[in-house]
Structure formats: structure tokens, C-alpha cells
Amino acid sequence: MQPRNAQLIWPNGKPRSETFDDIYFNEHDNTAETEHVFIKGNNLPARLDTGLFKHHFLSVGETGFGTGTNLFCLLALIDRCHKQATQRLYFLSTELFPLTHADLEHALTSFPAFAAYTQQLLDQYPPAIKGMHRFILNNGRCYLTLCLGDATQSFEQLSPQHNRVDAWFLDGFAPAKNPAMWSPDLFAAISRLSHTNEELALATHFSTFTIAGTVRRGLQQEGFLVERATGHGTKRDMQKGYFVEHSTLPFNTEHPWVNDVPQPTPKPPRLPTPWFTLPSPAKAPKHVVIIGAGLAGCTTAEALARRGVRVTLLEQGDEICQQASGNRQGALYAKLPVDPTLSGELHLTGLEYTLRLLKIHRLLDGKRADQCGLLQLATSEKEAQRQQQLLANNALSQAVVKAVTAEEASRIANTAIPHSGLFFPRAGWVYPKALCEALIDHPLITLTTHAKVTELNLRPCPTGTTTDAQRWQIISHQGELTADAVVVANAHDAKTLTPLSQLPLKPIRGQVSSAPVAPQASDNDQETTSDTKHSLNTIICGDGYCCPTVENNLYFGATFDLHKVTDEVRPEDHDYNLNTLSKMAPKLAESLPPTTQWHAKVGFRCATPDYMPIAGPAPDFDAYVSRYNKLRNDRKWPFEESPAPLQPSLYLSMGHGSKGLITAPLCAEYLACLITGEPLPIHKPMSDALHPARFIIKDLIRNKIGR
């Protein structure tokens, strides 16, 4: 279900839902109710003191994010009572009707005491884009995962093993006004993500403002012990409790009405997919080696270092970002499919995550990055029809994308555009090397250049150590290293390493042209040259792309060649890029100097057969083929749900193609959480779609792997 912005009215200057005729917070004591119902209702002050914060993170789940009040109150408690703690807070919330940025900013003026938190939320707040949005708050001490969409569907897509919850804030509009949310399916989904513990403080707790019988019975049916408690203010009662068991409770003979609770909607049986197993959450490694210092490697290094993990970054060249990440400007945008897909969701949520990193590191300065928007032009009738279908099928807000005429496109671009198209106002461009330099400027990250890796071997730990685990031995031109875990992020060069030789990666040659342009005229200049007259204000994209001028150069391209492997600049590729630019912006193309004055950058994109990135645990190829061999003859063979044969503590991030700026950072956050055993920023269908073993399974089903 696609999220839609909330429709609000503002009695007394406070937000109220026009759709549900209900308030977002108590206008008289807007934080006291949260502290009573949710903070104290989950017994969090005592639980944090007596053991919950002994672990390296606390996970809280919420229904109904609203204005974020509950999160702010919890952050205030932690900052007040546990300011020196190194543990992190993971706050998982859902919202089907998110406030617009303007409405949220208005609503948050009611919380001046939380200004330090509210500004961070506003800086990172996305439009109404379906999916999981990961926020980095308080310098990485808090991670908000905001699922925009239906609460039940959002929770059902999460892995209980990797997204378990310690405390539930069951909030939202009252059951009488929003019965669709408070359903048996919601309670079943909440139960899946809950856990028991012999030490009561460590078991999953819950609290809620409502005393509705449907809520009480629904939670009891799903394994929660429920009790009434004193409510806040004029509300006499509330409910709270803790998780007891995953199986449904036995028939209650003393109170038989408890058994009349509606049952969750039966789900169609799902074929087991044990081959998409993820490693069980484990203790964070002390030292991780990352092979490759492009976008994938540097973003992963930062995500791990932010969590206190020491990282050694190995680069075979003499500096970072020399290969596909080496362009001066890379377009930061999502080219969406006609129908909603996992690929489209990854691109949209990935774009928003990259924007958060750019803002946190203050890179949106017009030199290292710029959120200037992007025009995707309909340069053919077929593309025009595709764009119309996209708008009709995706129901995205105009804050994400809107249709524009040729005249509107020309005004936005500041040059003549002969095509209609789509305008993506949140898109922009990034200098990948500048982004990577900012990310790896961290005391826990060590960069080693001229370190081409030649061997990657799994070795037993030395005799006398306290663990029986194995460690990775990495041999490079700079010597030998050992590590608790390894992330391979060196694109198609990964195939040169023995454990990864079967990866289906393909290099795609691309040449980006750069043409010198005259410096832009200042506001005081009397004359406007043809160059400044057609200076781009936004990125234009059709069969190629062109970015606004930076450092008196116009960067545009790029060729797409699956067959040529030369890294030499080819004059005919300049001609191709000029022809492509002429179709998109003829006046701009005419203003450029001859191609003999141009320069170029040749790189090789690393792509996969399905053009989705590879991100996740590395499979043991031979063991996979052996274990799942029956898929050759029966794709529905009922395999046991046992862990898949993975390479221990070996992870991959590659195959990002031309979309690395929007996929590599989010994949890095995913890998960092997977490696450290922390809650994941993506749901199970997405991690399945990124899983490195997916091609082995597809080829077995097609019987394309030799016996």
C-alpha cells in the first residue's frame, strides 16, 4: 500500500488528523503522556539500569510514527541517564500517512526542548516513499528505521532473527477510529519480532494507551501477558505487559470469551528459501579488512567504523576511486520502472539514504555535491508512453517526481529542451571521490594503497586463542594481513580470488566526455555570452546525461559498451556523446568547443545479469550446488530450513553498475549491520533480491551449472 501524506487541520495550532478525527499528541502536556504510557509503561528506566543496556543495542518498535514524539522522549531519557553509554538505540517505526516536511516542521515547534533531535529528523526526512528509511541520529548513537507504508505489511517483511524488538510502543490513532491498523494480522506480526527471556527485564515488553478489548485479546492470542495499568491524565486505564511464548495460548476455560478473538488472516504457504539464509547475529568483529576503495568499499568502511569496528581498507591503485567511482560528477537519481518493483524501491530509498550522508558530512556545497534536481527526458514516443505509465502505476508525490512539458523543462534547465519529461527535484550530482574522502576520514579506518590482493584464504586461529573460529588471511602486494571478517568490494576483480571465481560479473565500458566552458557571468556582468546563456541549472538525462558545469567544465556521457575492453579514450565516443547531448539540449551542444579540446574518463561499470547489486554473505559455490542440486529437476523441492553453506565472515558489495551512488551506501549500512549483528535497514524480500547466492539458485533451476 503506497503511503499518502496526512491531511491535517490545526485547531489551536496543533495538528489533528482530518481523516481519522484524532490528535497526534496531547496539546496540554505533550510529553508527559508519552513518558507515562510508553517509557514507564515498558519499564524502560529500570530495565535500562538493570541489564537491557548491557547488550550493544536496544531495539524499540512502534506503530504510528506521527510527529516522532515517542522517539524524542526516549532519546531524552537515554541522554539524561545513560549519556556515557556506548550502546546504540534502534527505533523501528511505521507510518502509512506521513506528515509532509512542512507540516512536520510546524508540528515540531511544540517541542522546543527537543530542538537538537527535531532538526536532525527534519534534515533527513523523506517524502512519502514506500519502504524502509534508515536515519542516522546523534552521531550514530541512534538509528531510526521508518517504514512508510502499512504497519502489518512492514513488520511481516522483517526477519525475526535480524530485527527483533525489545519494547513495543503500540501507538497510533484509536482503534475505534482506525480499526484497519489494529488487526489480528498486526498482533501476529508483532509477535514474530518479539522474544522471551528467563530474565524478565530482557524479554520483549509492550505498552499502549488503548484499553480496547480487541487489542487485549489480540495480544493475548499471540503470546503476550496483558495487564491493565493506571492511565495518564483523564484516561483512567492503559495496557501493558510482556511476551510469554510464540505459540498461541491454550483455550481459556475460566474466561472463555478470550477464545473468541479473531484469528489472523491465513497466509498462503510460502516455499522455503533456505539458500537465502543470512548469518546469525553475532558479536561484532574487532577488525575487518575491506578489499577495494571505491564507493562500495569506502561506504562500508564508514558504516563499520561508525559502529566502533577497526577497518583496514586495501586499494590496488595509488589512491581511492580510480576505477568506476572516478568520475568528476555522478548523477544521483533513481530511474524508475513502470511498475513498483524491489529495484525501484531500492533506488528510491537508497537515494534518500545517500542524501542523508551528504547532509551529515556537509557535502552539498555545489563543488562536491549538489541537489539540483534531474530532468529525465522523453526523447522518443516510446519513452513518453513509459513515463505516463510510470506516473499512473506508482502514485508518487510531486515531491518525488512530476511531469513537465518541454517549455517547463527548458525553464528548469535554463537551456532549450525540445522534449517533455519527468522532473526529480530530490536528485542531483556527487563527486564520488570527495564523498569517499569524507567518509574514510575516521580514526578507525586505515587506508593502504598499492595493495592488490592476490590471495584470500581461511585459516584456523592460532593455538592458544580463546576461540575456535577461523580467521581470514589476506595476501596483497603490501604483505599479509589477518582479519575477523572480510568485505570484498573490488568490482569484477573479485573474480580473481579463488573463493569468488564463480561470480557472474560483467564489465561495461563507459566513456564520459568533458568540455571546457567559459566562466559563468556574475550578476554584475553586462554581457551574457552564449555559454552562460545555456548554462545548465539541473541534470538532464535521456539516452545519456549531462550535469551542470563545475570548475568550468561540462561533464556528459556516457557510452555503454559490453564488448570493448580498452581503457584508451576513443574520439568516436566523443562523437557519440555529442550526438546524445544534441538530442537532449541542442543549443547547449552547439555552444561547446570542438571535440579536439575535450577530455575524457574511461571506466568499467561492474554489472550483474539482473542489474541488481550483489550485497550480502558470500556463498560456498560447490557446497551450494551440492546441497540444492535437486532444484535441477524440481524447483519446488521441499528443502529443510537449515542454514545455507556460506563462507564464514566473508561479505560482498559489488555489481552496482551506474547506480552505485544510490545503492552502495545503503548496501554498506546493510552489510555493517549484518556483520555486527544489529537490526537490518532492509526487509527480507530486499535482502533476498541482493543475496550473492541468487544466481547459483537461478542457474540450478535452469540446469545451467555443470554436474
Predicted regions and their residues:
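The AdoMet/dcAdoMet-binding core of the Class I SAM-like
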Residues: 51-163, 184
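Helix-loop-beta segment of a Rossmann-like dinucleotide-binding subdomain
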Residues: 115, 338-339, 365-376, 400, ...
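A short glycine-rich, Lys/Arg-flanked "PGG" loop and its adjoining helix->strand segment in the class I
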Residues: 183-202
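Short beta-strand to alpha-helix junction loop
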Residues: 207, 339-350, 377-384, 421-438, ...
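Active-site substrate-recognition segment that forms the wall
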Residues: 256-283, 289-291, 295-307, 316, ...
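Dinucleotide-binding Rossmann-like beta1-alpha1 core, especially the glycine-rich loop
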Residues: 329-412
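Helical element adjacent to the flavin cofactor pocket in flavoenzyme catalytic cores
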Residues: 422-461, 468-477, 481, 485, ...
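C-terminal catalytic lobe of FAD-dependent flavoproteins
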Residues: 426, 591-707
